[in-house]
Amino acid sequence: TLPVIFETEAMTSLFSAFTGLWNGELLYKGISCLKDKWNEKILSEKITIEDDPRNVEALTIANFDDEGCPTRKKVLVKDGVFVQALHSTKSASCMQTESTGNGFKSGYASTIGVSPMNCCIVPGEKSLQQLEETMKDGLVITDLQGLHAGIDFVTTNFSLQASGYLVKDGKRDRSVTLITVAGNFMDLMKKVEEVGSDLDWSYH
C-alpha cells in the first residue's frame, strides 16, 4: 500500500462527516463509538482537535449558542487522547455536566441539538510540499466524493470515490481519478504521522 496524504479540502470533508463522534447526545445514547473511551488514547499523538465558535479566522463565529449559553474554545482531543465532548444543556444534564455552548439549531424551525462550530484538527508545522518531499513516493488525495452514501458513522467505515495525484521521488508525478479510497476513520487517524500546516477556514 502507498503512503497517503489527504490535502486540506479532502481531509476537511472526511473529518466533518465524523465530528458527531464528540457529540454529547450521541455519546449518551451510545451511538458514538467513543462512549467508553474517556481519557483514552484514541488517535495518533500528532492529533489535537479543537472546537472554537469564537475563532475570528473562521467564516462563522458565535459568542452564544441558540440556548443563550456562552460559547468557548474546547479541546476535544489532546495529543490523541479523548478529553471532552460537546454539549447542549439537554445533553449536559443527561451526562451530569455543564453545557459547552454547543446547543444550536440546524434551521429556523428545527429543534436545538448538539452541533460543533469551527471544529478542526490543530495544524502542524510542515507545508504540503514538505510532506510530499518527506513521503517521497505515495498518493495525495485532493477530492472525495460520495460522502453521503459512503460513510457509516456507527462503525466509522468509509468507501469513497477520490481523485488526486501520485508523488514520485518527492515531486508531483501524474493525476489520478476515479479511484476508491476505503478504510476506517478511527484506524486512519491512529496512523497519522504528520499534520500539515495549511489549515484553510474557507473549507469549513
Language model feature labels by segment:
Residues T1-H204:
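N-terminal small-residue-enriched
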